[in-house]
Amino acid sequence: MRNVDKQDNLVRAFKALLKEERFGSQGDIVEALKNEGFDNINQSKVSRMLTKFGAVRTRNAKMEMVYCLPAELGVPTASSSLRELVLDVDYNNALVVIRTGPGAAQLIARLLDSLGKSEGILGVVAGDDTIFITPTLDVPVKELFHSVCELFEYAG
């Protein structure tokens, strides 16, 4: 199985477990993922995933403190309102740069992060109104630039 497929399966299993709203500790999540066949999982990886997907601890129906992924913290999609936040897209021989309206970079970056390596995105760094996107080794910067422009319907 390819690395990207393994990662996608891990993310799906992780999100499915959190939807159950029964895990009170990161250790509980690690054990559940190991039981599902993810042998390389550890507490620090679970911690990073909790942060990446915006998980929070809240009380479930039994009044237990558990990790969950609230719907309002879900990954945004490229709706028309997000497209309007992208003011400029450019690139050089190393990365793609997106300029957004003030305060919008984090929202756009979260969408791009959710696409991940399967779409040629190695990593995303966002400030207040600027985003740097680094492509994976197998994707030329120009190709990633065109993909980003297409995603946000940016004509330049």
UniProtKB/Swiss-Prot annotation:
One of its GO terms (molecular function) is cis-regulatory region sequence-specific DNA binding. One of its GO terms (biological process) is regulation of arginine biosynthetic process. Its main location: cytoplasm. Keywords: Amino-acid biosynthesis, Arginine biosynthesis, Cytoplasm, DNA-binding, Repressor, Transcription, Transcription regulation. It is found in: Cytoplasm. InterPro entries: Arg_repress (IPR001669), Arg_repress_C (IPR020899), Arg_repress_C_sf (IPR036251), Arg_repress_DNA-bd (IPR020900), WH-like_DNA-bd_sf (IPR036388), WH_DNA-bd_sf (IPR036390). PANTHER family: ARGININE REPRESSOR (PTHR34471:SF1). This is Arginine repressor. It comes from Vibrio cholerae serotype O1 (strain ATCC 39315 / El Tor Inaba N16961). The lineage of its organism: Bacteria, Pseudomonadati, Pseudomonadota, Gammaproteobacteria, Vibrionales.
